[in-house]
Amino acid sequence: MYNYPHKNYRPFSAICDCGFGRKIIYTRQRQITWRNIVDELNKALAIHRQNAAEIEYLDRYYRGDQPILYRKKVNRPEVNNKIVVNLAYELVERKTADICAEPIQYVLRGTDDKKSDEISWLNAIMDSENKQECDIDICRWRSICGTAYRFIGNDEGNGSVLDESDFELSSENPIYTFVVYFPNNKPAFSCQIREDENGQEFYFCYTNGQWFEISEGKLRRFGVNGNGAIPVIEYPNNSRRLSDIEMTIAITDAINTLSSDRINGIEQFVSSWVKFVNCEVDRDSFLSMRQEGALVVKSNNGTENKADVDVMTTELNQTEGQVVFNDLFERFLDIQGLANRASINSGGDTQGAVNLRNGHYDAGLRTAINEPILKKSENMSIKIILNRLRISKGFTLVPSDVEIHINHNKLDNMMVKAEVLQILLNCGIHYKRAIKVIDMFSDPEQVAIESKDRMESLYTDKAEKQEEPKIEKPVNKEVVEQ
């Protein structure tokens, strides 16, 4: 398998040659079969190797391996502090928490009771398969390197007791996984790089109808893909596969340099050089007097050239350094769309005013525009999962019945949400729709099922209570009189 032992001693722009974002791999073939899969794989690997090198760099950067650690100083090399302010880690964790702090839930479109039970069962199966843990890992990879992959594989039990599904979910390492696309952006085939027991590298590829095992440039095995779709689904961070880290990597490098130099300035001030003017002091005498905390010198050239001893001090202006740091950090937050937790609030601020000023509102919008990209990939996953459940469990759900619900903080404006729920119910809105609209619960479908009897007794449909109006047939009076 690919091994990248290189340390991040160079800036990222030198690794990617200023070609930011991962390259999308395309094929010109109209169809991928056993006849052309080996050639197309070799073409794709040439592009993927560059992507893999960039992904490895960004992953090491996220873990703290940043260029400042390899800085060399020519002037006073003994004073060379290397401080990593790992904003990349904070960035990735905050971006991941925005989406995956609560489990992604599936909600039913409509009010069919049978399908509602199936949706609840689907959410329970996803929970038993530890889907949230898989989602968190996928969102981390998206933020770190710009893309991520989910694999929906066969579950043969693997010794698990009371396994409820015949599939398993896993997050694939994007260094060893990629998807190749047709020119119309439809997936052509996927590739997973693996090693056998002898350490020999081989490639496992899927198309919509077949799977292939390739090693040493030859097709070893192939068969039918029973999923009817490629079980490796890409989860891009955006259309350009830009990672969150590389968007501001120059700023984070500059903050590391600034922080290190500020510590260097303090250390150089504390351990300043001693300057001797018109006097000579041997090494042993100097060391002895320094331990005592005093120096005694005398002039060697009479009164005209008096002897003097001074400490050479030039302190770095920490105030100006803090101004630069604050400016860089503000630019970092603005570009990434993160809220500033350091802002000072006044006593009369409302929650809405605080959210606007501190950037929480903008951060929410950034997350919202990223959700459709995530939902597109999630829809591809749910199609494969529902197809498998239709065969094994007799599910009647279709993808159009399922609404993907990404949960955020449920504690904001709870009083307002409760009031809106009451208003909607009083206006005659169906209780299932009202519960979904207010976004108060992480699993609105389960809440609707548990509250069904109570809701139907309190908010019975008014139309059911009213008697059907009697329709009188028009009578032709002239005919009657005749």
Descriptions of predicted regions:
Residues 137-139, 153, 266-273, 342-348, ...:
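Short coil/turn segments at secondary-structure boundaries
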Residues 383-398, 429-446:
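Long amphipathic alpha-helical coiled-coil segments
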